[in-house]
Structures are given as structure tokens and as C-alpha cells.
Amino acid sequence: MFVPEEIIETIKMIEYQNLDIRTTTLGINLKDCADKDLDLLKENIYDKITSLGGNLVETANKVSQKYGIPIVNKRISVTPIGLIMGSTVKGLSDEEAVDACVEVGITLDKIAKEVGVDFIGGYSALVQKRATYEEKMLIRSIPKLMTKTDKVCASVNVATTKAGINMYAVKKMGEIVKETSEITKDAIGCAKIVVFCNAPEDNPFMAGAFHGPGEGDAVINAGVSGPGVVRAVVEQLKGKDIGTVSDEIKKTAFKITRMGELVGKEVANELGVNFGIVDLSLAPTPAIGDSIANILEAVGLERCGTHGTTAALAMLNDAVKKGGAMASSNVGGLSGAFIPVSEDAGMIEAVEVGALRLEKLEAMTCVCSVGLDMIAVPGKTPASTLSAIMADEMAIGMINKKTTAVRIIPVPGKDVGDYVEYGGLLGTAPIMPVSEFSSEELIERGGRIPAPIQSLTN
């Protein structure tokens, strides 16, 4: 039950502080679509997704209008394609298997455009320990896929706390990202590729969303975003102690989460599917004031990236989770604070003045979601360095038993001081410096970094 005061407060949040439902994501199980015949596989996928998701956009718009709450994105996530390609590629040559994977990806892109969603996720492989033949071929196909599709997002889980880090997969993903950067305009394909440690099965956010093997047949997951609301609250607390700031953020997260769950459940009910989770992640946009960096600066930092940034971010992340957990029993996904550089106006400014560097971002990922996100680096950066950056981030996730990820973009022809413009939610990325010292020998070793002792929890 919402009292009139809460409704008025929510209206103000929407009107003045950029509060919105960032996404309603329909997860769809495709395991029953598997077939040894490629044409039948594609037909099964088409029929399944369009039958369950054909009304997603219309329904989300209807619910948005009913409550007066913007739903910015409507998305679909599917069972990791690497799990359903086995019988289809059996007996094919490597080249034929890669092409078969790409054809499935093109089918997903066609469906996404037909039903009107913003993105479709799940062109994915779960290879934290080892990779099957079909998963190897799917990973190999990612660069080619990115030249032929617009709305398909790819993700590869290369590490978990239980399994350790698959360094063969880390090495390969550095090469895949490098190749993709060289064959897509301004390396835009890399913005749709995520490398994960401990990937959640119910994440509604792109580019890393997929419908996990442990999920049901169809489910709605909602992602709420309110950096502008949190910033406005913190700015009213000048001179207050940090515990008070934390308490007020918790209260705000509680309100935001209730709204997200209400809308998510309504969309699920209208579609006749289960409601899954509400993701508590504070996801920024390039809009002024809708920035995680600005929240941290309102807490008391001259610039995001200076000393104290990691501590302030830890407090913010914890407060958001505590407030959300009190509001709902259906919390999941990533649920933290995103720090994507290109998508956050405050982060961009911090990079420009030299307050924020890649090393500090890596430290910040120890306490937040989701990792090194939308980081643009010089196009000359070698694949081995990209892999090493991924390995560092995977280690943080593995040891800390949390989700971490890397979405890094080596932009051809660009160097430190340059920018690449993507527009929309992807924003503008300043090219950040990386170490020029080589990590190639480490990456060439391959193998698997063993799981830490924390994995023995049974």
C-alpha cells in the first residue's frame, strides 16, 4: 500500500531527479529449442521468443503509462547459446560451426528488431573451468557476429569462486575483443561484449544479461536506477556524519526498490509469466546529475578518484543493498553501483582532470558492481594486455566471492587524450592510458588459476 505522500514523492523523483525503471528484461528458456538441424533450431528459437516476448514492449509501455513511471529499456535475455549448439555443430568443420553460431545470432537480431526490444542478451558461453567444442566455436564467432548484428549482446563467464580462472579463456577473450575492435566502427562491437567472473543468472542489464540454466521457462527481471535521487538526498546532508548519510541512502533505496518491484510484477502479470528479481544497481546515464561520481563527490570528495573514493563507494553500495533488501524479498541480479566511465558524466570529468585512472577504477571494483565497464583504451593496446586487465578483474571477483566483469574497448586510431562518441546510454568515452609494460608471458602460459580456499564452503 502506497500512501499519498509516497506517491507525490515518487512523482518529484521522476520529474526532477531522473528516476526511472532502467529496464524490464524478459528471460526466456531456449533449452527445448535445441535441434541437430540448424534451420529447425532457428525456427524453434524464433517461435519461442516471439510467442513469449512479442508483447513485451507494448505491455511495458502500458504499465509505464498506468503508473507514470518511465521504463527506459525493454530487453530480452535467453539461455546461453553455447548450451544449445552442441547437436547442431556436431560433425561440422570449425568454419561451418562458427557460421552456424553466427546464423543463430542473426536470428536473435532479427527477432529483437521485429518485437522492438532495445537489446537481446544470451549469445553467451559459461567456460569458467573448461570449454566444450560448441562453446569454443561460439566464442570464435563473436567478432563476425558483431559485424552482422545490431542488437545482440555477447558474454563469456571465464571465472568463478568455485572453479577458479580459466586462463585459456581469458587469453582468447583478449584476442576476441581486439579482433572485434578492428572490424567494427569505432570498436562499437566491444561495447556489446562482457567478460565475467561469477556471472549471475538473473541479471537484467546489458550487455551481460542471459537467462541462466537454473531459471524457469520465462521470467521478468527489473532493473531500477536512481543515482539522481540518491545524489539529491546526499546533497541535503552537508555536515552530517557518514552514518547518517548511509541511513538516508538506505531509506531512499527502499523507496526506489518498492517502485521497481511494483512495476516489474505488473509487467510480469500482464505477460502471464513469473516475476523474477528487482536489481538494485544504481546505473548512471550521461545526463547531468545522473551520475555515481557525483554522489561520491556530494559525500565529500573534490573529485571522484581521489583518496577516499573506494571507502565512499563501499558505503554507498552497502547502503543501497541494505535498503533494497528491506523493501523486497526478490532482490537479485547484480545489485550494486555501476561505474561505467563513458555512461557517467561525472566519471568522464574525473578522467579529464586526471583524478580517475584505470588503477583506481580497479580498486573501486572491489566494493561495487560490476567491474571495469565501458573503458576505452588506445587502439594500439595488445591483446595480451587486454587479457591481463581481464585476469586482474576476474581475480578480484573470485577472491571476493562477487560478480565482476570487464567491458573494455580498444579504439583503433585513438590514443590517450582522444574521445570516442557512441551516443545514447553508451555516451562518450575518453581514451584512458594503460601500462605499456608487457604481460604477454603470463597470458601465454594458459592453464587455470586454481579456486581459492574460500571455495571450500561445503
From Swiss-Prot:
InterPro entries: UPF0210. It comes from the Archaea. Pfam families: DUF711. CDD domains: RNR_PFL_like_DUF711. Belongs to the UPF0210 family. This is UPF0210 protein MMP1427.
